[in-house]
Amino acid sequence: MRAVIQRSKEASVTVANNIVGEIEHGLVVFLGVQASDTEKEIKWMAEKIRHLRIFEDDEGKMNHSLQDRGGKMLIVSQFTLYGDCRKGRRPSYSQAANPEFAKRIYDLFIEEVKKSGLEVATGIFQADMDVQLINDGPVTMLLDSEKIF
């Protein structure tokens, strides 16, 4: 499982000219699923993101997490996080999970985050989405459940 996490002042997802998810002050999480992902990866990723200390304290140090702040999370599926660009000019998505499996893992990830009490908004799986966000910082983090980076 991979995630690109962006701290944002506000963010929204629009599908067919309708806003389907939006947050103020929180994290936008672009989530990619691979075929080998299990409940272990779901729990690890949800816990890691909720507790990443990437919000500033009164002294300007990144010392608070989304969980500490009671912030919101906008979760957007993005299979292209598993695009492999090492060969040729067209990315290969062979490491990305098939849509049926990926949707199940994506939905379970959302439920895992909701269990923590955080407010969660989402995009629509496999939809053509317009994502708008105002980065805060900017602060962008990359996570991989296999700890590649």
Curated annotation (Swiss-Prot):
Enzyme class (EC, first level): hydrolase
GO CC field: cytoplasm
The keyword RNA-binding is assigned to this record: yes
Keyword terms: Cytoplasm, Hydrolase, RNA-binding, tRNA-binding
Annotated catalysed reactions: glycyl-tRNA(Ala) + H2O = tRNA(Ala) + glycine + H(+); a D-aminoacyl-tRNA + H2O = a tRNA + a D-alpha-amino acid + H(+)
CDD domains, A to Z: Dtyr_deacylase
Gene3D superfamilies (alphabetical): D-tyrosyl-tRNA(Tyr) deacylase (3.50.80.10)
The UniProt record lists the keyword Ligase: no
A biological-process GO annotation: D-amino acid catabolic process
UniProt motif (Gly-cisPro motif, important for rejection of L-amino acids) ranges: 137-138
Subcellular location per the Swiss-Prot or TrEMBL entry: Cytoplasm
EC number(s) from the headed UniProt entry: 3.1.1.96
UniProt GO molecular function: D-tyrosyl-tRNA(Tyr) deacylase activity; Gly-tRNA(Ala) deacylase activity; Ser(Gly)-tRNA(Ala) hydrolase activity; tRNA binding
Listed InterPro entries: Daa-tRNA_deacyls_DTD (IPR003732), DTD-like_sf (IPR023509)
Function: An aminoacyl-tRNA editing enzyme that deacylates mischarged D-aminoacyl-tRNAs. Also deacylates mischarged glycyl-tRNA(Ala), protecting cells against glycine mischarging by AlaRS. Acts via tRNA-based rather than protein-based catalysis; rejects L-amino acids rather than detecting D-amino acids in the active site. By recycling D-aminoacyl-tRNA to D-amino acids and free tRNA molecules, this enzyme counteracts the toxicity associated with the formation of D-aminoacyl-tRNA entities in vivo and helps enforce protein L-homochirality.
Subunit structure: Homodimer.
Family: Belongs to the DTD family.
Domain remark from Swiss-Prot or TrEMBL: A Gly-cisPro motif from one monomer fits into the active site of the other monomer to allow specific chiral rejection of L-amino acids.
The protein, known as: D-aminoacyl-tRNA deacylase
Species this chain originates from: Desulfotalea psychrophila (strain LSv54 / DSM 12343)
